[in-house]
Every structure is written in C-alpha cells, then in structure tokens.
Amino acid sequence: MTQMTSQEPEARKRAGSAELDALRTAEERRVTDEGNPARPTGESGSMMLRRMNRSHADVTNWALDYLDFDSSATALDIGCGGGATMRRILDRMGPGSGVVVGVDYSEVSCEESRRLNADMIEAGSMRVVQASVEDLPFDDASFDLITTVESFYFWPDPLESLREVRRVLKREGSFMLVADVYRKEGLSRQVLDNIEKYHLTVLTPQEYRDLFVAAGFSDVTVHVRPGTDWICVEGVA
C-alpha cells in the first residue's frame, strides 16, 4: 500500500481526490439505477432518497423563496420522496395551525417521508399518503399551496395531472413546480444522457407556461436561475 506524505506534489493529492470522487459518482449511479428514481424501491431506493434530501436542498430553497407562506395554510407536496421538502415548507410556515401533506406513489418514499418527519406527524402538523398525482385522494379545493420538486419528470400524463392538481387547489391558491433542469441549448452531454436514460419529461420555459395555461392556471410565472439549469413555475388556481 502506497502512503502519501506531505512532501508529495499537490497534483498527486488532487489526482487521488479525483479518483475518490469518481468512485463515489459510480456508486451513486449504481444506487440510482437500482433504486429507480421514477418509483423508488428497496434499500437502494431509500439510500437514493436520503441523498436527494440533501442534493435537492439548494434548488428547493431557491424556489421556495418566491412563495409567501401562511402559518395557517394547508399545503400539499406531490412526489414527496424523502420528505425534506415537506419539512422545509413547514419551517417556512412557522408556528401556527398549518398542515403539510405529502403524497407519493412509492411505498419506500412514503416510508422515508414518515421516518424523517415522525415528530411532526405525531404532532399533527404533517401526514403522508400513498397515491398518484393522476388520482389525488382529496376533495376539490383542499389546499392553499401545492408544490412538486424534481417529480414532474416522471408524470405519465402531464396535462391531465396538472388539471388534477388544480382540482384540489383552493381558488387563488398557488402551485409551484420545481426542477433542476429545463430544455435549452447547451445542456451537458451527461444531462442529455440522463434525460434519455430515465425517460424524463423536460420542457422549455415556454412549454411549461403553455402547459400551465392549458391546465387552467392563471398568473403563470416562470423563473430560471442564471448560471444553472434550474427552473420553477408558479400558477394560480
């Protein structure tokens, strides 16, 4: 085994670090493939969701900054995954009577969301429901705010699903879609390969706007962050 000393060139240290990074990336790819990002399953799915709780933090917080939060609101997070977005929303709502509901059609995702938010579920501030965006098990006009973060890519029928979202949103309520990639010139080869590999629905800003309008949303606003591939789209019921 070769030991690295403080006298070795800095370039050698950087090479070693890059090698470790490459191994980590390969491991993450394996976990993602086995875990199935479209519908997380098994232990690899749980590992992937916990990683996504961290990796989605920046884009989520950037997008949530555009929203106003009411401490008495009832919010829904569609495709709640590992549950971190639910917690971020409740934190921004602050003390009060507000409730955040998470929905996901993956059993593993629901388990992870419940695990992460067990204290808030016990307190009555959260609940998690296993269901699909295509058939949300809620009455019309149930929510003041609805979000979906890094989930829209996998919706089988985007237009009908958005209409279902609008159905359960209260009049004048807000819906926000958040994604860390949108269709544009200059996307990296790795991003393009992932879009193809995982069969992701990735739209241009104008296509998102048109889709929201077709689903019946008004006051549609599209935000993109310069220097990134991030996008968030807001619509009002």
Task: Tell me what each language-model feature is.
Residues 2-30:
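N-terminal auxiliary segments of SAM/dcSAM-dependent transferases
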Residues 25-53, 174-234:
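C-terminal alpha-helical "lid/dimerization" subdomain adjacent to the S-adenosyl-L-methionine
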Residues 54-73, 88:
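Conserved alpha-helix/loop element of class I SAM-dependent methyltransferases that forms part
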Residues 72, 96, 169-175:
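Short glycine-dipeptide loop
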Residues 74-135:
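Class I SAM-dependent methyltransferase SAM/SAH-binding core
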Residues 134-145:
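A short acidic, Gly/Pro-enriched loop at the edge of an enzyme's catalytic core
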Residues 145-157:
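A short SAM/SAH-binding and catalytic strip from SAM-dependent methyltransferases
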Residues 159-171:
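A short glycine-rich, Lys/Arg-flanked "PGG" loop and its adjoining helix->strand segment in the class I
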